[in-house]
């Protein structure tokens, strides 16, 4: 499975979960975070004496970690705290904007999934009509930025936000797809 190298802190509970069934972690500091590569929701245990701030980006890879003692594992959307849910959209937007090249590349290279469905159509707001506009425009010249996409396809006025909405949709297991 793909692993995250960095994560953005969504919530930091210095006293742990108040009404936790996980007695092992009751009263122990814990953080909820989102990975910056694959948008994985994670539970992290900070190192002793480390105070984390919401929106901090922390290293959680295989090497030496300065702030994080342990990655407890994946977190389900329904177990996010109220604070994490509020921070989530902002964090996703930041990650998308900080990785513009990667997401613009998706618009340039996404192909068909089947004869009836194209990867671009998985993004909310993109149907057959816009999908073909994107495919035709990228044939002429690959897109260089979100702004370039908007300039060449005015009907897609905010491609970054469309990706943010898709990621939110993917993560929110509480609503029907």
What are these regions (language model features)?
Residues 118, 140, 144-162:
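Compact, charge-rich alpha-helical regulatory domains located at protein termini
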Residues 1-97:
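Structure-specific DNA junction-binding interface
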Residues 123-124, 140:
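Exposed beta-sheet edge/beta-hairpin loop segments within beta-rich domains
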Residues 133-135, 149:
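Short alpha-helical segments in extracytoplasmic peptidoglycan/chitin-binding modules
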Residues 5-10, 123, 132, 153, ...:
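Intrinsically disordered, low-complexity regions
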């Amino acid at each position: 499975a793909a692993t995250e190298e960095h994560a953005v802190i969504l919530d930091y509970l210095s006293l742990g979960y108040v009404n936790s069934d996980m007695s092992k972690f009751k009263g122990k500091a814990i953080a909820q975070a989102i990975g910056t590569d694959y948008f994985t929701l994670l539970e992290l245990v900070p190192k002793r004496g480390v105070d984390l701030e919401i929106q901090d980006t922390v290293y959680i890879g295989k090497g030496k970690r300065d702030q994080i003692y342990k990655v407890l594992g994946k977190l389900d959307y329904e177990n996010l705290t109220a604070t994490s849910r509020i921070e989530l959209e902002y964090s996703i937007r930041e990650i998308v904007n900080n990785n513009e090249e990667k997401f613009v590349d998706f618009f340039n290279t996404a192909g068909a999934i089947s004869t009836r469905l194209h990867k671009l159509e998985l993004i909310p707001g993109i149907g057959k009509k816009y999908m073909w506009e994107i495919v035709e425009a990228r044939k002429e010249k690959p897109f260089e930025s979100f702004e370039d996409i908007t300039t060449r396809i005015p009907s897609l006025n905010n491609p970054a936000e469309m990706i943010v909405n898709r990621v939110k949709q993917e993560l929110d297991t509480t609503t029907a797809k």
